[in-house]
Amino acid sequence: MNRNNIAENPISQSKLPIERRRVEFTLDDVTEKYYYRGNPQVSAFFASLSVGFPPGEAEFIKSVKLFEDQITDPKLREEVKNFAHQEAHHSFQHKLLNQKLNELGYQTGGIDNVFKEKLARREKQWSPQRRLARTVSAEHITATWAHWALGSEEKMQHFPTSMRHLLQWHAIEEIEHKSVAFDVYQQCVGDRRLLNWVYRHFLYFEFPLSLTLTTRALLKQDNYKPTAEDRRVFKDFLFAKKDGMVSSLWPHYRAFTKQGFHPWALDDSGLVDDWKGTLSPYFAH
Ligand SMILES: [Fe+2]
Ligand SMILES: [Fe+2]
């Protein structure tokens, strides 16, 4: 793939159809508060990610739709609609998961409110261009995480099956639509300096800080003191050289600010094809 051509050609460069699916996960097997290997830290970390999805994804949709009228490429316009459909359904499914997590003892209401207030403030204070740049940034992090979720079975196998499949379905769709916000930005804004600045702020500051604070807040509800083994599992989960969620894909997180970058420079369409078959029993088209 010629990355320079992609950067110069400001229309849809998607590699996969962005499918509209309906899914159903019972979540009957999510029965423990510390559902991931009995580990409170990994479990709270994913609970806080899940709480962040519904407000976050609502903002992704809004910020892309702000530019809908300026999109000249009919393929990209159609993709925006399918992207919005997918993100809305992710939110719906994560709300069901969050409800389940609340039943298991996580009190997520306060965190949800903080997210919503922060986004409402930004809606008033930030320019549409900056909001779209943040969405493009978050979509790259999400798509990179999605690549990890589909390629790291050893780590993923410890989630309860239905929750693992929910996360992997979400991952498939994040990869399918990973270039939509980017292509909209390229066509309608095109300011790479702004984009790189917003991305660096998101990657090194906003995202890790927000996740650390929300994970800590959830753990504090139990007056939790981590054991050495808890710490080891959590550290391995994030930073194992071979398949850590952060460390193993660090070059892909960083690739974003390189000249000529496009989300499909990492072609993971094969991963999606492999997983679609496994998860198809959950899909009701
Ligand atoms: Fe999503
Ligand atoms: Fe997304």
Where are these regions (language model features)?
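Non-heme di-metal
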Residues: N2-H285
